[in-house]
Amino acid sequence: MADRVLRGSRLGAVSYETDRNHDLAPRQVARYRTDNGEEFDVPFADDAEIPGTWLCRNGLEGTLIEGDVPEPKKVKPPRTHWDMLLERRSVEELEELLKERLDLIKAKRRGTGS
């Protein structure tokens, strides 16, 4: 019989308690603006630290209108294969290896060409 009473009810998903006579948690609203000029509000807890940027629903990043300007992120140049190679060997060593490999290839060509 208990199954019939709960049928159709979303247990745990819906609170059946009324919202009257309850104090909501203190909040602060931060306003952001995207590069295309769209403004949107994001509610935060009163004691939360407000981030300088927030992702808008349209996919663009919004900047906090009133508040600290976010520091630009440091962008490291991408490490190329050549950079990683130079970390392990000097240019002189690489030239020596190249000469050895070229001599080896030339010797193979002479041996198979005759």
UniProtKB/Swiss-Prot annotation:
Q: What Gene Ontology terms describe what this protein does at the molecular function level?
A: bacterial-type RNA polymerase core enzyme binding
GO annotation terms (biological process): positive regulation of DNA-templated transcription; response to antibiotic
One Pfam annotation reads: RbpA
* Alphabetic keyword roster: Antibiotic resistance, Transcription, Transcription regulation
Q: Answer yes or no on keyword Ligase.
A: no
Q: Give the record's subunit note.
A: Monomer. Forms a complex with the RNAP catalytic core, specifically with the beta subunit (RpoB); its binding site may overlap with that of Rif. May bind free principal sigma factors.
Put simply, this protein is called RNA polymerase-binding protein RbpA
- Supply the source organism for this entry: Mycolicibacterium smegmatis (strain ATCC 700084 / mc(2)155)
Its gene name is rbpA
